[in-house]
Regions:
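Basic/aromatic-rich interaction segments and small domains that mediate binding to polyanionic partners
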Residues: 357, 362-396
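Catalytic palm subdomain of template-directed nucleic-acid polymerases
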Residues: 630-662
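Active-site-proximal helix-loop-helix substrate-binding element of RNase H-like nuclease domains
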Residues: 132-135, 142-154, 174, 178, ...
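Proline-aspartate-enriched helix->loop->beta-strand connector
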Residues: 166-190
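C-terminal, non-catalytic extensions of nucleic-acid polymerases
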Residues: 660-915
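Common nucleic-acid-contacting/processivity interface regions adjacent to the catalytic cores
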Residues: 18-21, 272-354, 399-450, 456, ...
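DnaQ-like (DEDDh/DEDDy) 3′-5′ exonuclease domain used for proofreading
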Residues: 1-174, 287, 291-353, 400-409, ...
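Glycine- and acidic
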Residues: 148-152, 172-176, 274-280, 412-421, ...
Length: 915
């Protein structure tokens, strides 16, 4: 089975594929893909049912009847050579890697590319032997070499020696997979650029076993590809596989949370640690790779990635792109069936390209974030220029960006803020995959659609059509799958209804209709994945009963891999350039709008059902919803049915019974919806289930809540269990709070959920605020970032002045950065201490009245001027630090709970004036 693949698109060996296999080792060969031309007398059949014949050799790229001409070469090779086998390799040479460099300032794509700072140490772990290595720069020759206990410390007199010895080990270990943390952005490119600068162009190529290294200047997130070596960034894998957003993605925080292993703590800067305590510096450097090792032992994201990539027959670096994963999987599935795939819609019809000038774009890798607006596109160069929200022009690779979604997402019911009791959920099982299967959705089953004003309309169902005037004319569109153009037309309402019912077409909430006489390939693949997942779940259970824990973990990985693939398919329909979509977001709108319609109809049914049962004037019992789930307060029904029950355990048991009855009725309602709304006359896959019972819940807004879960999937959850508390998005415990305040907010919410009295809550707040007087001031600093700087400097300091004049409405963080920069320049410390630049992370310190008459300063937290630190310690305003972070949040919380005003104390100024 393949271990790595590299295809040469340029140079003397253009068209050569380099392939490493766990049995055959390295091979290289010219790859000439087979393409297919539409031919009524051909022996092969396409996805759309047309006949075609194979062509080998040259062909006219602009000929729209030539199919499979735009398949990425790596995907073509892996499909053609391995389509009969989904297994992963029996072995890999994996290393965990981390580097440290001299202080460089802000890490930007350009500063990494310039690579002006020395590499001071390189730590790695060879997974095959578990041996740890640390190469450290030791120009003072004060460090003794170590080679014992499976750990080797190699001091090097010069950086050139360090890099040369590291390269020797790299060649010896011959890695197939290298794993770091934020390594695609920093470690890998920095090693390459610094090594090229110090060792030269020829030696740096030895990082690649085939002497091929790609430098993609337009992909700042992963600019370097080392041919023959798979680079996997654990930070990106954490963002991919851990669905909830983490408060922090720093390695130390993730390691502490998931592997109980954090960073080595130290005072001052890393440069100072390197100079003053090299032994601890070595320990610090090794700890980073030890954390990666511990994370992988716990989470097994590398193994999971390799499994998924081999199930999909794609290179490992494709793991971050669901479009590539799903394309590889379906290409392979169709190859096994002897079916020829279509070209991408954007290959056939250039006018529906994914990106246009003026589009808002977001990153495809990691957590999607809106970055800016496109101002220029260079399709041949594979790049675009964007203008960020900070009005800065940047270049980006077309492979790493996508257009901001322009279709409906999941339905979010706006909750009424407050505290709720005895809550149950109604959760759709795999909502989007079930919609694809129920509608028989696919580009080859898509018949046409009713023209809508936008991609957010949800009321073009069969039921709505029957309420229209039968003689009214509707605008419709049909997709021409040979040209990917939309053919427009008109049809009377009654004629369309007749066509839908006679042909048994399913119709989505957005007005697209799909044939059911053939099964779409997406449905086939989803059903295959579902069966495979169930198969491995059964094997996992069997292994668990036999206490075969090695296979238990393996089967668990396989079932998780298939779950991830199932849930990833729907999003690819929104990408115009995905091979198996329509190019107009018709299919994607069908999925998400139908999902919204199902959720809304279910909420309507549940509210109506409970209104009739309880009959107390209340009309809304569903508190909130989030894409595929709704939360229902059953307190009134519980009190009505069982008014005399006082035992809490018995209440929960009865609550489970009531919620199950409600779910049964709601599922019967889904049977009606599938027929009336979607015209699904056969089996549908829509299903609601009850998963959690919540004793107490607090909602402050959409996706902002805290729940005390007492039962999950029928299993009682004790209050101290890790699953007992589910908190998300609450303002009082934001990720950008100082940890001290964030922990206080979390504990406060816990107390509220656990029925602590208001009087005790009031006291808890007072005690916390009073405690700040004796707490280390550094724990109060507010973490933030610097987005703007120079535009808020109205006038630089004149002779004899210290501080700049600021423009109006200068943000507080910008003000703090400007004042600190001014102080550093005034004290002539710019060579020892860095000034703030746009993009830097920083900490804010609010100040009391002081000799400088400034109210805030910024600190970087690792290499601050001792004079500035001493000044901040003397004049920090702890009152203002509390007010800026917590005051409004606490007031909003009390308002949500209808507790009135927050009484911090009876005599605030006297009681809480910090020294």
């Amino acid at each position: 089975m393949y271990q790595s693949i590299y295809y040469s698109y340029n140079g003397e060996d253009k068209g050569t594929c380099y392939l490493r296999d766990d049995k055959g080792g390295w091979s290289s060969f010219k790859y000439y893909p087979t393409v297919y031309k539409l031919d009524p007398d051909g022996e092969h059949v396409t996805l759309f049912g047309d006949y075609c014949s194979p062509i080998r050799g040259k062909f006219d790229w602009n000929d729209p009847t030539i199919l499979e001409k735009d398949i990425q070469k790596e995907l073509g090779v892996l499909r053609d050579l391995y389509y009969k086998d989904d297994s992963a390799p029996t072995s890999h040479n994996t290393i965990y890697l981390d580097i440290e460099i001299e202080i460089l300032g802000t890490l930007t794509p350009q500063s990494i590319r310039d690579a002006n700072a020395k590499i001071t140490s390189i730590a790695l772990i060879d997974v095959n032997t578990s041996k740890k290595y640390c190469y450290i720069l030791d120009d003072k020759q004060s460090i003794e070499p170590v080679d014992k206990d499976n750990k080797k410390i190699i001091p090097c007199f010069t950086e050139q020696e360090l890099l040369s010895k590291f390269l020797d080990l790299w060649i010896e270990l011959d890695p197939t997979v290298v794993v770091g943390y934020n390594s695609d952005f920093f470690d890998i490119p920095y090693i390459y650029f610094r090594m090229r600068k110090i060792l030269g162009e020829e030696l740096v190529l030895f990082l690649s076993p085939i002497k091929k290294i790609n430098d993609n200047i337009y992909n700042p997130h992963s600019p370097i590809t080392i041919g023959g070596v798979n680079s996997l960034d654990y930070m990106l894998l954490v963002k991919k596989y851990i669905m909830k957003e983490e408060p922090s993605y720093k390695l130390g925080d993730i390691g502490t949370k998931y592997a109980k292993l954090g960073k080595i703590e130290y005072n001052g800067s890393l440069d100072r640690l390197f100079r003053d305590d090299p032994d601890k510096f070595i320990e610090y450097n090794l700890r980073d790779v030890e954390i990666i090792e511990a994370l992988e032992n716990k989470l097994q994201f590398i193994k999971l990635t390799i499994l998924i990539c081999h199930l999909c027959h794609v290179p490992y670096d494709s793991i971050y792109y669901n479009t590539v994963l799903n394309e590889g999987a379906i290409l392979t599935y169709l190859k096994r069936k002897g079916i020829v795939s279509p070209n991408k819609p954007t290959t056939t019809n250039k006018s529906i390209k994914e990106l246009n000038i003026g589009d808002e774009i977001q990153h495809q890798r990691g957590t999607p974030t809106i970055e800016g607006t496109i101002t220029y596109i260079d399709e041949r160069g594979g790049k675009c220029q964007i203008r960020t929200k900070s009005n800065i022009l940047k270049e980006r690779s077309l492979k790493t960006v996508r257009k901001k979604d322009s279709y409906a997402g999941g339905y979010l019911l706006e909750p009424t803020p407050g505290l709720y009791s005895y809550v149950s959920d109604a959760d759709f099982t795999s909502l989007y995959p079930s919609i694809i299967k129920s509608l028989n959705l696919g580009v080859e089953t898509l018949v046409g659609r009713i023209v809508t004003k936008n991609n957010y309309e949800q009321y073009n169902s069969l039921e709505q059509l029957k309420q229209l005037n039968p003689e009214d004319q509707l605008d419709i569109e049909k997709l021409n799958t040979k040209t990917y153009n939309l053919k427009k037309g008109k049809i009377r309402v009654k004629d369309l209804i007749e066509l839908i019912e006679e042909n048994n077409w399913s119709i989505s909430a957005s007005g697209a209709f799909y044939r059911n006489d053939i099964k779409s390939i997406s449905c086939e693949v989803l059903e295959d994945w579902f069966k495979q997942r169930e198969h491995y779940r059964e094997l996992k259970k069997k292994a668990g009963k036999q206490e075969d824990w090695e296979n238990y973990k393996l089967y668990d990985l396989y079932q998780l891999a298939f779950k991830i693939l199932q849930n990833a398919l729907y999003g690819t329909y929104a990408i115009n350039g995905w091979r198996y979509t329509d190019g107009y977001k018709i299919c994607s709108a069908s999925i998400t709008n139908s999902g919204q319609r199902l959720t809304k109809e279910s909420i309507l049914f549940i509210n109506g059902k409970l209104e009739n049962l309880v009959n107390n004037g209340r009309k809304e019992f569903v508190i909130a919803s989030d894409t595929d789930s709704a939360y229902v307060e059953l307190k009134d029904l519980l009190n009505l049915k069982y008014p005399d029950i006082t035992d809490e355990g018995e209440k929960i048991s009865k609550l489970i019974e009531l919620s199950q009855e409600l779910i049964t009725d709601a599922n019967q309602n889904l049977d009606n919806i599938s027929r009336k709304v979607f015209n699904i006359q056969r089996k549908h896959y829509f299903e609601l289930k009850q998963e959690v019972i919540v004793k107490k819940a607090y909602w402050s807004g959409k996706r902002r809540y805290a729940m005390w879960i007492v039962n999950k999937e029928g299993v009682p959850i004790p209050p101290d269990h890790k699953d007992a508390l589910d908190m998300k998005g609450l303002d009082i415990m934001k990720s950008n709070f100082p940890p001290l305040f964030r922990d206080f907010g979390e504990e406060l919410i816990k107390k509220i959920l656990f029925d602590t009295s208001k009087q005790e809550i009031d006291k808890y707040i007072l005690d916390f605020r009073k405690s700040l007087d004796t707490i280390d001031w550094r724990k109060l600093l507010k973490p933030t970032g610097l987005k703007k700087l120079d535009e808020y400097i109205a006038k630089k300091p004149a002779a004899g002045e210290i501080f700049s004049k600021l423009a109006l409405k200068c943000p507080t963080n910008t003000k703090g950065a400007i004042y600190t920069n001014d102080l550093i320049r005034f004290k002539k410390q710019t060579k020892q201490y860095e000034t703030f630049q746009v993009g830097d992370k920083m900490y804010l310190a609010y100040l009391k009245e002081n000799p400088y008459h400034v109210d805030v300063l910024g600190l970087n937290g690792y290499n601050d001027s001792p004079e500035i630190l001493e000044f901040v310690e003397k004049y920090i305003d702890k009152n203002q630090m509390f007010e800026s972070v917590m005051k409004n949040k606490l007031e909003n919380l009390y308002q949500d709970l209808k507790w009135g005003a927050v009484i911090f104390n009876n005599n605030v100024n006297k009681f809480f004036t910090f020294s």
